[in-house]
Structures are given as structure tokens and as C-alpha cells.
């Protein structure tokens, strides 16, 4: 008999949530990570790393008691527009009778709460090193810190730079846009009123509302040359650049915090169940353009799918047929999202009069067909049929 029903590698939002979901189904779970998250108290300043969670993701995390003491702010509207042309679209929660389209959450606070909830429910090895992985039809064996540990199922949730996938010889294929982005927290003259802003111009600039009404989380996806230039500006000059690029949508940007740069891209593994008893979820399975704001939400959809499948399995967590269906459906969902994001990126990136004309026509069509807009919002909120494709 294996030592565990499941070994989960990666203790971020997706991996820790998966561990808690399986544990509450009375499964024996081992969570392995190369590091331990910082568990210090909350700072006065909002974390640079934020995530926009769909209502479905919020419901899952609340059911696990993971949203306690986690600061968050509702996104009630999303306005998307471009510098040239008139391609503007607004998504409003009121249009579908919802309180919010999403909630912006601090990553560090959420991970800390998830890890606190792991105590006495899940065995955790961190910081630990996985030296070898072997998957067979009978069990999965890992060498962790020179100890041999077995499980009925391996769940890889380590993110885009997964060392476990490298050991298994599995690599993701690039899918469309690649680039770099700058993240920070900014203060503005005007209040955000719960509205997220996304501007297509010199790259893609997003303002996400934070609990303080004149504070926003900033993610600016940029071409390489422009990225290098902006990252070297002093804070005053960078604030001025944000004011200009956002077209003063919230008045002047008066202050910016520490900036972090990070790469982004779209990628997809060939198979979410590439070997017997092995599953790949979250950013380890696929990465999407930050304009989507859906990376973590897709990973939490994976977790809900795993929870659903585990509920129908009796003893053996590694039963092959059920996981094949799960893997095929989750990858299909990922392909739809990747193609949609690539379409938006190319559409808004098209220059010239014909590009603007086509873009404006498409956006006006969406605005005039409530059913299309309604379905787009429901899918983004994790409530549409594609979101439950597992």
C-alpha cells in the first residue's frame, strides 16, 4: 500500500488548496515545496503581488477557511479601451445581477492562511528537495531528501518553472505572446470606485482596485525595449508615465511603490496526465497572458475538478480512466483560453486604419449583443459551462 493517496509538489495557492481539498475528503496527502512561505504579519502597504479571483474561486477558498484576515477588494466593473480608435467595452456586475466580477487579493496573505490551515490536516515537507520521480502503473515513487516516499497519485503544481516536470522530461510549448511586465502599487488622485481598468496602447496597462479607494495594483505588460526603459525611471518619472499611459483615467498617479519585473507568456503542456498516476495542474500545466487575470482561477478550476473526481474514486486515487477524462477536458479548456487571449492581444495590437476599424466593429458588436457579453462575464467569473469542463 502506498504511503499516501496523493503527493502534491508546490505549495502556492493552487497546490495548497488542492492539498486541503483532498484532505477534507479524508485522503492522505503529502505536500512538498522547496521553500516555506513567510508567515510574518501583514504590512501596512499592500503586497505588490496580487491576484484577481473569480467568485467561484472565492467560494472554494472560503469553504476551506482560507480567506480569514486576507485583505481584498471587489471588482464591480471592468473598463477596457485603447489609445487610438473607439474600441471601448465595459463589463458591469450589475448587468448579470452579481455583486462583483472578481476580488483582488494579496497573494502572500492568502498563501500564509492556506499554510496555517494545512496544520494537522496535511503532512508537509518544506523546505525539501525532490531528487527523483518514478511513475508506474502501481504507484508513484519520489526520493525526497534521500527518503523514498510512495503515493497512489502525483499532482504537480509547482508553477511555470516546475523542477519536477523537468525531471520527468516534460516541457510546455510556447503559445502566442511572450514578454515582460512591471508590477507595483500606485496611489491616484481620483477614487477607483471598484472599477478595474485595462488600457491597450504602449503595451497593456491594468489598474486593479485595492481596499484603499485611491490605491491600485498595477500590471504593465510591455515590449522589451520599453520595459528596460521604464524599469530604470525614478519613482516620480514612473508615476508620470503611468498617468500618461492611463490617459489620467483616475487623475494623476501621485505615488508608486517598489517595482518588480517579471516575464510572462502563454504556454501549454502536451498532456495534463502525461504518465500513469501523474497530473499537472495550475501554471505548471498552462500559463496565460496577464491581461486575462485568469491564471490562478484556471488552476483553482483544476483543483475543483480533482476534488470532484476524487469524490467518485473509492480506494485508488490513481485510477487511470477517470484522470484521462479530467486531463483531456482541462486541456481543452486551456486551449480555448489561450486562443482567446491571443486573439485579444493580436486584435488590440493591430495598427493602421483597417485594424482599428475591425476592432471597433467587433467591440460594438459585443456591446450590442447582451447575450455574448453576458456569457463572456460568466466564463470569466468561473460560472459558465467551459469553467466546469472536467
Each language-model region and where it sits:
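Conserved N-terminal helical subregion
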Residues: 2-3, 59-62, 72-167, 175-180
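N-terminal Rossmann-like FAD-binding beta1-loop-alpha1 element of flavoenzymes
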Residues: 4-31
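Conserved Rossmann-like nucleotide-cofactor binding loop
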Residues: 14, 37, 161
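Glycine-rich FAD pyrophosphate-binding loop
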Residues: 23-46
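N-terminal glycine-rich dinucleotide-binding loop that anchors FAD/FMN and/or NAD(P) in oxidoreductases
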Residues: 45-70
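Conserved FAD-binding catalytic core of PHBH/FMO-like flavoproteins
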Residues: 61, 146-148, 154, 158-261
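FAD/FMN-dependent oxidoreductases across multiple families
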Residues: 230-320
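C-terminal helical "tail/cap" subdomain of flavin- and related membrane-associated enzymes
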Residues: 308-390
Amino acid at each position: 500500500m502506498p504511503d499516501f493517496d496523493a503527493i502534491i509538489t508546490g505549495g502556492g495557492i493552487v497546490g495548497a488548496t488542492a492539498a486541503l481539498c483532498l484532505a477534507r475528503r479524508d485522503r492522505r496527502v503529502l505536500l512538498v515545496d522547496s521553500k516555506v512561505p513567510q508567515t510574518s504579519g501583514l504590512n501596512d502597504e499592500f503586497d505588490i503581488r496580487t491576484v484577481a479571483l473569480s467568485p467561484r474561486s472565492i467560494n472554494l477558498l472560503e469553504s476551506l477557511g482560507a480567506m480569514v484576515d486576507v485583505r481584498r477588494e471587489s471588482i464591480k466593473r471592468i473598463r477596457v479601451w485603447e489609445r487610438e480608435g473607439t474600441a471601448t467595452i465595459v463589463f458591469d456586475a450589475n448587468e448579470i445581477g452579481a455583486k462583483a466580477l472578481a476580488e483582488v487579493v494579496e497573494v502572500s496573505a492568502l498563501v500564509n492562511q492556506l499554510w496555517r490551515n494545512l496544520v494537522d490536516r496535511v503532512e508537509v515537507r518544506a523546505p525539501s528537495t525532490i531528487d527523483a520521480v518514478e511513475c508506474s502503473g502501481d504507484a508513484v515513487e519520489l526520493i525526497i531528501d534521500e527518503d523514498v516516499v510512495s503515493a497512489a497519485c502525483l499532482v504537480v503544481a509547482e508553477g511555470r518553472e516546475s523542477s519536477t516536470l523537468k525531471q520527468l522530461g516534460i516541457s510546455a510549448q510556447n503559445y502566442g505572446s511572450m514578454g515582460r511586465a512591471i508590477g507595483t502599487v500606485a496611489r491616484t488622485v481620483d477614487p477607483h470606485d471598484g472599477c478595474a481598468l485595462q488600457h491597450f496602447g504602449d503595451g497593456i496597462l491594468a489598474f486593479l482596485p485595492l481596499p484603499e479607494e485611491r490605491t491600485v495594483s498595477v500590471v504593465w505588460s510591455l515590449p522589451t525595449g520599453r520595459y528596460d526603459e521604464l524599469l530604470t525611471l525614478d519613482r516620480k518619472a514612473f508615476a508620470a508615465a503611468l498617468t500618461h499611459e492611463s490617459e489620467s483615467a483616475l487623475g494623476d498617479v501621485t505615488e508608486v511603490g517598489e517595482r518588480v519585473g517579471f516575464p510572462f507568456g502563454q504556454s501549454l503542456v502536451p498532456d495534463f496526465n502525461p504518465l500513469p498516476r501523474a497530473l499537472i495542474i495550475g501554471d505548471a500545466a498552462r500559463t496565460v497572458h496577464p491581461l486575462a487575470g485568469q491564471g490562478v482561477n484556471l488552476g483553482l478550476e483544476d483543483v475543483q475538478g480533482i476534488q470532484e473526481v476524487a469524490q467518485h474514486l473509492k480506494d485508488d486515487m490513481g485510477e487511470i480512466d477517470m484522470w484521462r477524462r479530467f486531463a483531456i477536458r482541462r486541456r481543452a479548456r486551456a486551449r480555448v483560453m489561450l486562443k482567446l487571449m491571443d486573439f485579444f492581444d493580436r486584435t488590440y495590437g493591430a495598427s493602421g486604419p483597417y485594424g482599428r476599424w475591425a476592432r471597433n466593429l467587433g467591440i460594438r458588436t459585443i456591446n450590442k449583443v447582451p447575450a455574448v457579453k453576458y456569457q463572456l462575464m460568466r466564463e470569466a467569473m468561473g460560472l459558465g459551462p467551459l469553467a466546469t469542463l472536467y
